[in-house]
UniProtKB/Swiss-Prot annotation:
One GO term describing the cellular component: cytosol
Keyword Methyltransferase: yes
Cited Pfam families: Thymidylat_synt
Organism: Legionella pneumophila (strain Paris)
Subcellular location(s) of the protein: Cytoplasm
Full protein name: Thymidylate synthase
Coiled coil: none
Binding-site positions, (6R)-5,10-methylene-5,6,7,8-tetrahydrofolate: 51, 169, 263
Active-site residues from the entry: 146
Protein keywords: Cytoplasm, Methyltransferase, Nucleotide biosynthesis, Transferase
Transmembrane segment boundaries: none
Pathway(s) annotated for this protein in UniProt: Pyrimidine metabolism; dTTP biosynthesis
């Protein structure tokens, strides 16, 4: 995961100081890309420990089309707590847009189901896209989508995925996003009887919050460890039937966790 450390270093060296919605302040760069070969290990950051339970359960929660944090809390995941209302609701965030994007005529579109079907029937399509950026519902969301759009690509019976992340909290958020979309790529590949190829992460406003700079510098002193591998223990009937127990990250070694405050 030296690729990720290079992004940290790039922001520390080249970033410009900017104000932000949270009032914390950031060092920011615009436009950055990282590529991860999924055949050479699963891209979990090793220079600090990641909470893989949160990564898996959050993705399963998205896939359910859920927008209430009750499922997350039942499974010991707190990463969305700060944005939920008193009832645990977040408004029409990721899961809603992925699974039931509303249309003008009162119907909904299950973007993910459609994309999986397209990959199976027309793998050369250039329209294998899922978007969470629904302009008509942004004002109803507790947090507008940071990872806004992703696209699949099939070549030589191998599946790749590229994510566009308009706003990237590089210290806290991006390691989760890399792992989450890499996991999704593995799951979709299994459902479509494909092998995996690459996950490509493309960031817009890539930033380190000013109260994360020391933590980023600590992380840069650590030597990356070998990447783990992912085992998916069964192939369920659909993309939406996976369970937490279906996934195992083999040989995940990491340096200790590094605590940092979240900007709300």
């Amino acid at each position: 995961m030296k690729t990720y450390l290079q992004l940290l270093e790039h922001i520390l060296q080249q970033g410009v100081e900017k104000s932000d919605r949270t009032g914390t302040g950031t060092l920011s760069v615009f436009g950055y890309q990282m590529r991860f070969d999924l055949t050479k290990g699963f891209p979990l950051v090793t220079t600090k420990k990641l909470h893989t339970r949160s990564i898996v359960h959050e993705l399963l929660w998205f896939l359910r089309g859920d927008t209430n944090i009750s499922y997350l809390k039942e499974n010991g995941v707190t990463i969305w707590d700060e944005w939920a209302d008193n009832n645990g609701d977040l408004g029409p965030v990721y899961g809603k847009q992925w699974r039931s994007w509303p249309t003008a005529d009162g119907h909904t579109i299950d973007q993910l189901s459609d994309v999986v079907q397209q990959i199976k029937s027309n793998p050369d399509s250039r329209r294998l896209i899922v978007s969470a950026w629904n302009v008509g519902e942004l004002d109803k969301m507790a947090l507008m989508p940071c990872h806004a759009l992703f696209q699949f690509y099939v070549a030589n019976n191998k599946l790749s995925c590229q994510l566009y992340q308009r706003s990237a909290d590089v210290f806290l958020g991006v390691p989760f996003n890399i792992a989450s979309y890499s996991l999704l790529t593995h799951m979709v590949a299994q459902q479509c009887n494909l092998d995996v190829a690459e996950f490509i992460w493309t960031g817009g406003d890539c930033h380190l919050y000013l109260n994360h700079l020391e933590q980023a510098q600590i992380q840069l002193t650590r030597e990356p460890l070998p990447l783990p591998s992912l085992t998916i223990k069964r192939k369920p009937a659909s993309l939406f039937d996976y369970a937490y127990e279906d996934f195992e990250f083999l040989n995940y070694q990491s340096h200790p966790a590094i605590k940092a405050p979240i900007a709300v």
